[in-house]
A protein has these predicted regions:
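Short hydrophobic-aromatic micro-motifs
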Residues: 38-43, 166-168
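Active-site microenvironments of metalloenzymes and redox enzymes
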Residues: 40-152
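An exposed tryptophan-centered "aromatic clamp" motif
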Residues: 146-173
Length: 199
């Protein structure tokens, strides 16, 4: 009888762990239910200036290869620039005003960056999340046009169709107010958000 009870407890614990692992959203994301498809885990908001600065801090502290290992510690006092994530401050000044006001713009979307820099951000974020949270391995990446279409179809409340910001897609187009615009034809500020793909 004791043996059956112990086996029952073990099974309940294992099931609780499995359910908990599946119910946990990857850090920074919201789960979106898509009809007849697996759930999509998407950033609730576009990547902010403070998110970007944190990734830049890590990249300034050590090489990208070492990020997400015990060899890398984030020390943000480094003044040397790393071109992989450095932003064009002129774009910030045009959009947000003087750089001295960065405390006021921390939560606003990051702008003035290239698609290569967006991809670097996604890789760094993936490494850090996988290092800090071992429950599930995730890969962060830009959303595709299909992802945005599914979010629109699901009427996802965090997708702002009136935003003045365009969002870069993995396809190289800009999602703007419910439409996809070729990058060369879009003249507004461009930002991005990530989706988390569970491995």
């Amino acid at each position: 009888m004791k043996r059956i009870f112990i086996h029952g407890v073990i099974i309940v614990v294992i099931l609780a762990i499995i359910v908990d692992t599946k119910a946990t959203n990857p850090p920074g994301t919201k789960r979106v239910k898509i009809k007849n498809k697996p759930a999509l885990y998407v950033d609730q908001h576009t990547i902010s200036n403070i998110d970007w600065k944190e990734a830049l801090c890590w990249l300034r502290s050590c090489s990208e290869e070492k990020i997400g290992t015990t060899e890398c510690v984030c020390i943000c006092q480094h003044k040397e620039k790393n071109s992989a994530l450095e932003i064009d401050s002129i774009v910030w000044k045009q959009r947000y005003g003087a750089i001295e006001k960065t405390k006021e713009i921390k939560s606003l979307p990051i702008i003035g960056i290239s698609s290569a820099q967006m991809a670097t951000y996604c890789r760094i974020r993936s490494k850090l999340v996988n290092f800090k949270f071992s429950k599930q391995k995730v890969n962060y990446e830009l959303l595709t046009e299909e992802d945005y279409q599914e979010l629109l179809a699901a009427r996802w409340k965090y997708l702002d169709n009136k935003s003045e910001f365009g969002e870069m897609t993995a396809n190289g187009t800009i999602f703007f107010q419910g439409n996809f615009i070729p990058m060369q034809n879009f003249h507004g500020p461009i930002t991005f958000r990530c989706k988390a793909v569970i491995k």
